[in-house]
């Protein structure tokens, strides 16, 4: 079977979505299929041009390549899932959230645009085309709930393992830090962690890994750390290799991941594979599908004081952090996540 995986690429931005597409491609090839990725350029920073990019996707014809039929299109992201195909399956990583739950959220460009309302309505109308697919899957229950709530579209949650799942481990000796690996953006809430650090009673230290959405945002976070007086307890690792990331997981006391209504979040699963407790928030979305409060981690209210209390607790009670981490690893094993099951469902 010849399969195209349709997604988008924001130039100079790479993260979980790109790993997701590559993982799916590898799984399809391993199952004996011919598969490739078509990544459509997408620039959400210019809201007025988003309808043009939607139209460009709608006009693409991927039904055949060099005279050979494409048997199936598996579409992952907005606006690539608008590409028409008679045998299309959509596995929604996320919609354009600025038109939905992140409307009016700080640092989102759409609501601040003079034509923002018009573009938002165009996006919402276009998303109704999801119903044309032969099947709609969601990357998590959280995404499935959003699709139902905002679009009235039913979808099936379909989990998958993170990249290189078999490579994660837990070190015998932990370091003196919590680990927070993530793209730096307002929705990931690195700023909340900095504010919590300023309120901790213990000398908690945090290592942040990942690049900022923009150089300006990265500078803003560092200025905030200085303003709060916590810069000596923060380490900015920036880009890290996969090996460096796994090593940081392995030696961490625990993992912090408190995003705003996250879609899925490899970070939670990678922490569980590394036998690390996860500290997250009540409104963090995807992580809550895997983190059980007082069993595999701590779930706090989304404010600095509550998060600081959780940081202090696991910083002081290392045995408890290790216990939660072991339980997280057991929970991951019980879920039985596999790419072979993903392929089976997408091609059914």
What are these regions (language model features)?
Residues 293-305, 313-318:
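Conserved acidic donor-binding segment of nucleotide-sugar-dependent glycosyltransferases
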Residues 277-281, 291:
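Short hydrophobic beta-strand element within catalytic cores of glycosyltransferases
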